[in-house]
């Protein structure tokens, strides 16, 4: 159909111009402007609290997997291209680099603060019923 505006996610961030679309506002830049330069939290890896003593092990396995991908970038990009939705190797590499990087391993102090702020805003707006407890594994 025809629409006046929309939000582009995933690969669309890199390919929207190929479809004749025009960027009106970058939500990441908007968030940073509105929130003292904090990064926009787009996702994260979570582990269920009821796993108890297994949490550190699961966290380490996730870290190891992410680190492997970072250290073996070509292999990781080639693997990810299976789901790349017609991206070139260069586009896939750029897209992966936007979301899988050193911040994936450690959000940093500003990243942790951004996650907390994001959830606080969601709670105040009634999007989530209560503020969840946050534990960041490093």
Give the residues covered by each predicted segment.
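Pocket-lining segment of extracytoplasmic ligand-binding domains
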Residues: 1-82
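Flexible, active-site-adjacent loop/turn segments at secondary-structure boundaries
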Residues: 22-29, 43-45, 98, 103-105, ...
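Secondary-structure end/capping motifs
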Residues: 52-121
């Amino acid at each position: 159909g025809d629409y006046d505006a929309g939000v582009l996610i995933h690969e669309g961030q890199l390919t929207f111009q190929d479809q004749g679309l025009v960027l009106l506002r970058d939500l990441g830049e908007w968030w940073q402007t509105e929130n003292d330069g904090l990064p926009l939290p787009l996702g994260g890896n979570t582990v269920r609290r009821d796993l108890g003593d297994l949490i550190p092990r699961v966290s380490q396995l996730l870290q190891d997997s992410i680190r492997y991908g970072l250290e073996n970038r070509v292999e990781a990009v080639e693997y990810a291209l299976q789901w790349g939705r017609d991206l070139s190797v260069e586009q896939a590499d750029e897209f992966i680099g936007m979301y899988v990087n050193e911040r994936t391993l450690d959000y940093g102090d500003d990243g942790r603060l951004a996650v907390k702020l994001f959830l606080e805003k969601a709670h105040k707006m009634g999007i989530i019923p209560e503020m969840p407890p946050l534990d960041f594994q490093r």
